[in-house]
Structures are given as structure tokens and as C-alpha cells.
Curated annotation (Swiss-Prot):
It comes from Escherichia coli O139:H28 (strain E24377A / ETEC). It comes from the Bacteria. This is Tyrosine recombinase XerC. One of its GO terms (biological process) is DNA transposition. Forms a cyclic heterotetrameric complex composed of two molecules of XerC and two molecules of XerD, in which XerC interacts with XerD via its C-terminal region, XerD interacts with XerC via its C-terminal region and so on. Residues 109-288 form the Tyr recombinase domain. InterPro entries: CB, DNA_brk_join_enz, Integrase-like_cat_sf, Integrase_catalytic, Integrase_recombinase_N, Integrase_SAM-like_N, Recomb_XerC, Tyrosine_recombinase_XerC/XerD. The keyword Cell division applies. Residues 2-88 form the Core-binding (CB) domain. The gene is xerC. Belongs to the 'phage' integrase family. XerC subfamily. Coiled coil: none annotated. Its main location: cytoplasm.
Length: 298
């Protein structure tokens, strides 16, 4: 039988040399495995052969009591299962003691969205230069069609059909979809196209950086965040919030879950159903504000 640390060091070398994992990933594995080493040592274990499912379960409970979140615990147990699988492959263990141990489900975090009043304030930016026109067009398209950030930066001029008010986008899994973008988005795209040649680009991209290249996702994130601050929005404005806001506002207005699924390009309806929880939050807030029986203490 071998020392606890020795086996972990051998495993980390395997991950580095044979699996060629990045230094950051290796460091994460090391941290997770050091946690189980400390727990095992505290409980008198001298080798991994002494580790059984009860030890792993107690380790999981201890991790939770120390404040480790459900998602982080799931990652820790995943690292532990991978390590024990490797020990089994090395004939150091007969079975993986972590195989039947799972973390509790992480609580569902509903996506943040921007309400209609704040969205109107965000879109009403001061147009004082060509880049501001570009940003207004990007904001209008993002909110008007519920695009993913990757879909927005991937748009080419050839993907536009401004006469019909539609764009073609390439979504996840190389799936194309044709989307309406609304009259405001069309108007601002046309305004931007009148100025686009100022950047002297031969690139086919619809939205360009100030250097005349296709705008990057990072640049879009930075510009949207800056506009959120300038327009006085309390919460950080991230491109994905515009997509969430599009979905929420569409569902509040139409109640058509299948239609929203198609517009968002979700393969599974279950992915779209999270917005029904947001819609319920909206209805609940309306109820609490308006219904006589909800007004406690009055």
C-alpha cells in the first residue's frame, strides 16, 4: 500500500503528462484532492484502500458544513471520482468508493433581466459618434431578436434582409434560424450601414471595431457595460441580460412558450421553461402590489 500523498502526486503527473491538462486545471485537481487527503488523515486513514463509501459521504457532509456550495461540491466529488477511477485502473483499488455519492442539486438561479422601463432608458443612448450609432444598432438587434452574443458578433451583411426586417443567424450546433428583428433595429442598422464605410474595412462583418475588424465578444461586453453605467442602470448590463429580457418580455406579452423556444433557438423546451418562473415572479409581484388580501398589515 502507498502513501496518500504519493498516489495523488502520481495521478497529477498522469494528468499533466498523458492527459496534458492545463496548469490551472491541474491546480484545481490538486486543491480538491488535498481536501480529501486532509480529511482522510484526520480520520486515521493511511492508504486509499481504507477509503470506502462511508468515508466519501462523510467527506461530502463535512464539505457542505464548511460552507462549500452545491455546485462546488459536485466539482469536488467529480475530481474524486476521476482519481479513484484512475486508482482502479492502476489496480490500487477494486472499486470506486465515490461512484454512488452525489452532491445535492444546486439551487436554480433564475437569469437576471432588465425591466421594460430600464430597457427603454438603455436604448435611448446619446448618439454623438459613429461608434455610438453602432452600439445602438447592436443593442436594438440584441434585444429585438434575443440573440446570443456569439450570434451577434457573427452577423455578416449578407445575413440581413432589411426589406422583410429579418436576419439569418447561425446558432448552437450550426443550426440556422431566421428571425424578425423589429422596425427599430432595422432603422438603426440602416443608420449604421451609412457610417460603416468610415472604418474602411473589407470585412464582411456587420458590426466592426474602430480598427475596421469584426467586433469581438469582449468589446461588446465592455461597451454594453459602459452604456449601462452611463444610462444610470443599477445592475451590470451584460449582453446575455438583453437575451433574457427579450425572452421574459415576449413570454409576459404572448404566453407562447413554444414560440419563444423557436426564437431563442433552444433545442429543448425545458431550457426555455426557466422563463416561466420569471413570468411567475412578475405575476406574483403584480398580485402582491394589487390584491387586497396580499397587502399585509393594512
Amino acid at each position: 500500500m502507498t502513501d496518500l500523498h504519493t498516489d495523488v502526486e502520481r495521478y497529477l503527473r498522469y494528468l499533466s503528462v498523458e492527459r496534458q491538462l492545463s496548469p490551472i486545471t491541474l491546480l484545481n485537481y490538486q486543491r480538491q484532492l488535498e481536501a480529501i487527503i486532509n480529511f482522510a488523515s484526520e480520520n486515521g486513514l493511511q492508504s486509499w484502500q481504507q477509503c470506502d463509501v462511508t468515508v466519501v459521504r462523510n467527506f461530502a457532509v463535512r464539505s457542505r458544513r464548511k460552507g462549500l456550495g452545491a455546485a462546488s461540491l459536485a466539482l469536488r466529488l467529480s475530481a474524486l471520482r476521476s482519481f479513484f477511477d484512475w486508482l482502479v485502473s492502476q489496480n490500487e483499488l477494486k472499486a470506486n468508493p465515490a461512484k454512488g455519492v452525489s452532491a445535492p442539486k444546486a439551487p436554480r438561479h433564475l437569469p437576471k433581466n432588465i425591466d421594460v422601463d430600464d430597457m427603454n432608458r438603455l436604448l435611448d443612448i446619446d448618439i454623438n459618434d459613429p461608434l455610438a450609432v453602432r452600439d445602438r444598432a447592436m443593442l436594438e438587434v440584441m434585444y429585438g431578436a434575443g440573440l446570443r452574443l456569439s450570434e451577434l458578433v457573427g452577423l455578416d451583411i449578407k445575413h440581413l434582409d432589411l426589406e422583410s426586417g429579418e436576419v439569418w443567424v447561425m446558432g448552437k450546433g450550426s443550426k440556422e434560424r431566421r428571425l424578425p428583428i423589429g422596425r427599430n433595429a432595422v432603422a438603426w442598422i440602416e443608420h449604421w450601414l451609412d457610417l460603416r464605410d468610415l472604418f474602411g474595412s473589407e470585412d464582411d462583418a456587420l458590426f466592426l471595431s474602430k480598427l475596421g475588424k469584426r467586433i469581438s465578444a469582449r468589446n461588446v461586453q465592455k461597451r454594453f457595460a459602459e452604456w449601462g453605467i452611463k444610462q444610470g442602470l443599477n445592475n451590470h448590463v451584460h449582453p446575455h441580460k438583453l437575451r433574457h429580457s427579450f425572452a421574459t418580455h415576449m413570454l409576459e406579452s404572448s404566453g407562447d412558450l413554444r414560440g419563444v423556444q423557436e426564437l431563442l433557438g433552444h433545442a429543448n423546451l425545458s431550457t426555455t421553461q426557466i422563463y416561466t418562473h420569471l413570468d411567475f415572479q412578475h405575476l406574483a409581484s403584480v398580485y402582491d402590489a394589487a390584491h387586497p388580501r396580499a397587502k399585509r398589515g393594512k
